[in-house]
Design a protein with these regions (language model features):
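Catalytic core of membrane glycerolipid acyltransferases/transacylases, capturing the structured
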Residues: 36-94
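Short, well-ordered coil/turn elements that cap or connect secondary structure elements
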Residues: 22-24, 60, 79-84, 140, ...
Length: 211
């Protein structure tokens, strides 16, 4: 049974985050397509520390984030928050076998897993090549990837970690389903998701409205 603090976190946090983000930055959620039924993987770009809470708020229900282990052990409040949202730890520079097992188990239970394939914050999309982990999980579990593009978070809370005024959005893309198996399927799925992300975050499309 899900622990009380996990249930409480997901009951309260998404609404609170959406409210505060709308108040500060005119936060909007733009959907190109409806979410598929779980299980699935959310794969998002990573411009800012704001991205995980805004992505979680856009989904609005329980999910498990794959999170760098470096974030733990620095601030007790951050540790408590990450643990309340059941973050799956990945140690930098290692093969994340434990994280893979935990992610696959959660997907097998009908859950949603969120991965940031760049593996770290980047000043802009395309600066860091995405890693294949999200696509590998999708192919292995036989579930789709849903793209989420964070837009504007780098302008209001970027690499210098200073808050600024601006507009932020989360754009929700279509579901990308694995085709085939093995490395070819992983590469194909990574390519399709990356191409969508490049379009969603391109300056010519960033200002376009959503559904």
């Amino acid at each position: 049974m899900l622990a009380f603090r996990h249930r409480l976190a997901w009951r309260v946090a998404p609404k609170a985050i959406r409210f505060v983000a709308r108040l500060l930055w005119g936060f909007r959620i733009e959907a190109e397509a409806p979410f598929p039924e779980p299980p699935f993987i959310i794969a998002a770009n990573h411009l800012s520390f704001l991205d995980p809470p805004l992505v979680g708020a856009a989904w609005g229900r329980r999910l498990k984030f794959v999170t760098l282990a470096d974030l733990f052990g620095n601030y007790p409040l951050l540790d408590f928050t990450l643990e309340s949202f059941e973050a799956i730890r990945v140690k930098r520079g290692t093969i994340p076998l434990a994280a893979m097992r935990q992610s696959l188990a959660h997907l097998a239970e009908g859950g949603v897993v969120c991965v940031f394939p760049e593996g770290t914050r980047a000043a802009r999309w395309g600066e860091v090549s995405p890693l294949p982990g999200a696509a590998w999980l999708a192919v292995r579990a036989g579930v789709p990837i849903v793209g989420m593009a964070a837009i504007g978070t780098d302008l209001v809370f970027g690499m210098d970690n200073k808050l600024r005024r601006g507009r932020v959005r989360i754009r929700i893309g279509p579901a990308f389903y694995p085709i085939g198996s093995g490395r070819a399927a992983v590469d194909d799925l990574t390519r399709r998701w990356s191409e969508w992300m490049a379009r969603a975050t391109h300056p010519d499309t960033r200002s376009a409205g959503g559904a």
